[in-house]
Regions:
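Short hydrophobic beta-strand element within catalytic cores of glycosyltransferases
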Residues: 296-299, 309
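Short His-centered aromatic/hydrophobic patch
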Residues: 97-103, 121
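Nucleotide-activated donor-binding/catalytic signature segment of Leloir-type glycosyltransferases, i.e.
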Residues: 240-259
Length: 374
């Protein structure tokens, strides 16, 4: 059985790491995974470093790059024959899409070639009635969380959709002190500081400006030696706005913009506290990575965060955009180390039980095999 994973290639995020976890599991089965990229960039560099082969197919305009319906339709039609030919020539059985642009571009060429199309939805879908047409484009839908599952179009029958949690390598953990020394050396972090960390894309809806404001307010009232590291990349305009905010609030000596890092779990293991300030996360992959690495979590309440974190049991949640509640929850970590260790241990146990790569792969492969039978 040949399973094709097409990707744009312009970024590396949670969906890519989830598929790489699945890839490792599939390699030991009778399934042949094949990667296709449409851009040479961050993802191709990562695959090269892992010695994973991929095909490159140039696509000038992917469907969904523009929100205008006529342009989406034009891109689907324009790219149809090239992709349909590739699927037929390589005798692909299943196309597994993990990105909106990929799903819109590849789904019809796949279905009309006779291949099975699996639409892996990793973001909350809007309430637009146009999404009801997605049932014509895909054979099956997988959602990564309850909030994503509940946002799927109501006309998708239950027999054609499933909630499957993202996979993680729960066995791979780092020694905290070694990780901290490594991060200190790379980014010149003060050795004795309490290190708060954010890791993810630098985009507006991630609410990083709120985190910076909270950090600045706390440091002005506290004698603790705190440092904030922001790991990730975004467009220049937003990133520069964040840098200006840091300078405006007078905390530029206590905030490090680290850029992209290929080993997020190792970075997370160096944090004394990981902060996730968005309330709109469809899942929250970095939260689970922190749970595995025994790093305590402070996250905004809402979205996938509320599904992953049991407040006060496996992490702490604060009310979205409420600075006072943020500070209050942070103080609970700082002032009660014994209870913090209990939360860390609870979180680690939960992560290992719920998010193993093995159980994820079993669920996905079950869908693959069922597609061949039907």
């Amino acid at each position: 059985m040949k399973v094709l994973f097409p990707f744009v290639g312009d970024s590396v995020g949670g969906s890519h790491r989830s598929i790489l976890e699945l890839y490792d599991a599939l390699n030991s089965s009778a399934i042949t995974p094949i990667f296709v990229l449409h851009e040479i960039g961050p993802l191709s560099s990562l695959l090269d470093s892992l010695n994973i082969q991929y095909e490159y197919i140039f696509i000038k305009n992917l469907a969904g790059e523009s929100p205008y319906i006529p342009k989406i339709i034009f891109s689907i039609v324009f790219n149809f024959f090239k992709l349909n030919k590739f699927i037929r020539k390589n005798k692909i059985d299943i196309v597994h899409g993990n990105d909106l642009r990929i799903n819109l571009t590849w789904s019809l060429p796949a279905r009309l070639s006779g291949a099975f199309y699996l639409w892996h939805q990793r973001a909350v879908m809007s309430s637009s009635v146009l999404w009801k047409t997605s049932t014509l484009m895909a054979d099956y839908f997988v959602a990564i969380s309850e909030c994503v599952y509940n946002s799927l179009p109501s006309n998708i029958p239950k027999s054609k959709k499933k909630l499957i949690l993202n996979p993680f390598d729960t066995r791979k953990t780092y020694e905290i002190k070694d990780s901290r020394r490594w991060v200190n050396s790379i980014y010149s972090i003060p050795k004795n500081s309490i290190l708060l960390g954010y890791i993810g894309r630098l985009v507006d809806w991630k609410n990083i400006d709120f985190l910076i404001s909270c950090f600045a307010k706390y440091t002005k009232k506290s004698s603790l030696h705190l440092h904030l590291i922001i790991v990730g990349v975004g467009n220049d305009k937003y990133t520069n706005n964040l840098r200006r905010l840091v300078c405006k609030l007078g905390v530029n000596s206590m905030v490090t913009f680290a850029g992209f890092n290929y080993d997020p779990s190792r970075v997370i293991s160096a944090f004394d506290l990981m902060v996730a300030p968005s309330d709109k996360e469809p899942f929250g992959r970095t939260l689970v990575e922190a749970m595995i690495q025994n790093t305590p979590i402070l996250a905004a309440k809402g979205g996938g965060h509320s599904e992953i974190i049991d407040n006060g049991v496996s992490g702490r949640l604060y009310e979205h955009n409420n600075i006072d509640d943020f500070i209050s929850q942070f103080n609970l970590y700082i002032n009660n180390s014994k209870y913090t260790h209990k939360i860390i241990n609870n979180a680690n146990t939960i992560a290992k039980l719920k998010y193993s790569s093995h159980s994820h792969a079993e669920s996905i492969v079950c869908i693959y095999r069922q597609s061949i039978i039907t």
